[in-house]
């Protein structure tokens, strides 16, 4: 880890410690039984014609504020109406302007899978994700030791959450195991935040043939999605391309027309 990612993880440890002081993990565990069964993001992507995972985020470390006043109750239903296969909701507050409340708000408004996108480092965050209504969580190889990543994946499954493992390089291929439901290739280096969509193509041939593959970050051209499909990808996580426009749902709708 280095640069921006190191700063994010250091802050995340501090943040989770504070949250544990406010609400214990035992209190979270008590609320798990009241949560409805999860929707399968893996199945949604495998059976989808579009594979678009539309992302709700207000800002990023590299771009600053994208849509500061964005409200999930307005944007999330528009994503669904446009044809999103699944939703990604950023819940990191300091660096991405999100919160768990965004998932809680969005959950009753849509019937597609929602993934909690955050920097998961502790099982406490898995309980949080389950309670607010997430169906899946992101585990980032660059942010976790391999043993810890597998441990969190197993704990996620125990809670009925699916796991999207995010890798960026061939060095992280050993993180892939039977506990991983989907494999995401991040086209953005989390140390420098430099983006290169060709990263997905470079790694695609080294991944299990039966894996549900997701390309993440830097996708703004419908032609790239067509190329990614040919390379074996079933999911395409896109946020800024939609969120930076006045009507994200309408932008998604036009994007989908262009990739059909």
Swiss-Prot record:
Catalysis: reaction(s): 1-(2-carboxyphenylamino)-1-deoxy-D-ribulose 5-phosphate + H(+) = (1S,2R)-1-C-(indol-3-yl)glycerol 3-phosphate + CO2 + H2O
Record has Amino-acid biosynthesis as a keyword: yes
Coiled-coil intervals: none
SUPFAM superfamilies xrefs: Ribulose-phoshate binding barrel
GO MF: indole-3-glycerol-phosphate synthase activity; L-tryptophan decarboxylase activity; phosphoribosylanthranilate isomerase activity
EC number: 4.1.1.48
Single GO biological process annotation from the record: L-tryptophan metabolic process
Pathway entry: Amino-acid biosynthesis; L-tryptophan biosynthesis; L-tryptophan from chorismate: step 4/5
InterPro entries: Aldolase_TIM, Indole-3-glycerol_P_synth, Indole-3-glycerol_P_synth_dom, Indole-3-GlycerolPSynthase_CS, RibuloseP-bd_barrel
Keywords, in A-Z order: Amino-acid biosynthesis, Aromatic amino acid biosynthesis, Decarboxylase, Lyase, Tryptophan biosynthesis
Pfam family of the protein (one): IGPS
Family assignment from sequence similarity: Belongs to the TrpC family.
Protein name per UniProt: Indole-3-glycerol phosphate synthase
